[in-house]
């Protein structure tokens, strides 16, 4: 496997599976780097008591929908199975990852610990991680004195349309080569009775 010296940015989709009004995508496109769209289904998360087959089916259906909409840009989301750090380690052997964009996730302890761990790995590997807010939860504030002000400034922002992405995303041809090195997420959903 030959490493590309072309600097890239990665949009790491977590729970925010949308294209429009997605600050992570807008910022990655504005970075003027080639952008790889990534979704990782984590084995540790699937095995967590909070997760069910319905979650997995929703994720798969959302990825199928997003990929259909991304086809006009000659790309799709690289949807892989594995633990996040191992996935980024593999990608860093193939690309010069400069920046990662994702939303600022709030939720369960397992994802909080994962984010702390991957943040450390990004720093050690000189990768800048930009977490974009997509809702009104603000971690780490001591009291609620300024919460209303923070929340209002967040919700008063205009909805951001999908930016122009032609020739700014990793192509299907390149993705075909990348996929050879990963366990891909099967996007077919299971029928539930």
Question: Which residues does each PLM region occupy?
Answer:
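Short acidic, glycine/proline-enriched helix-loop-strand junctions
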Residues: 110-134
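Glycine-rich, charge-decorated loop segments at or immediately adjacent to ligand/cofactor-binding or catalytic sites
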Residues: 135-148
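Acidic beta-strand-to-loop metal/phosphate-binding motif
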Residues: 98-111
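Acidic/His-enriched low-complexity segments
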Residues: 43-48, 91-98
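N-terminal beta-strand-loop-alpha-helix module at the start
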Residues: 1-75
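Glycine/tryptophan-enriched, flexible segments
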Residues: 125-127, 146-193
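Structural beta-alpha unit
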Residues: 78-94
């Amino acid at each position: 496997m030959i490493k590309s010296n072309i600097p890239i940015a990665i949009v790491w989709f977590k729970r925010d599976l949308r294209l429009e009004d997605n600050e992570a995508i807008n910022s990655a496109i504005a970075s003027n780097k080639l952008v790889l769209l990534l979704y990782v289904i984590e084995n540790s998360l699937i095995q967590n008591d909070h997760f069910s087959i319905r979650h997995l089916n929703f994720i798969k259906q959302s990825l199928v929908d997003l990929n259909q909409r991304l086809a006009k840009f000659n790309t799709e989301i690289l949807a892989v199975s594995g633990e996040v750090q191992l996935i980024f380690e593999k990608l860093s052997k193939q690309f010069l990852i400069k920046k990662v964009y994702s939303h600022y996730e709030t939720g369960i302890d397992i994802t909080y610990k994962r984010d702390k761990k991957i943040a450390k790995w990004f720093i050690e590997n000189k990768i800048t991680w930009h977490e974009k807010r997509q809702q009104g939860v603000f971690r780490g504030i001591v009291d609620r004195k300024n919460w209303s002000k923070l929340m209002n400034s967040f919700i008063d922002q205009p909805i951001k349309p999908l930016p122009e992405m032609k020739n700014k995303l990793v192509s299907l041809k390149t993705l075909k080569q990348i996929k050879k090195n990963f366990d891909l997420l099967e996007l077919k959903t299971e029928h539930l009775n």
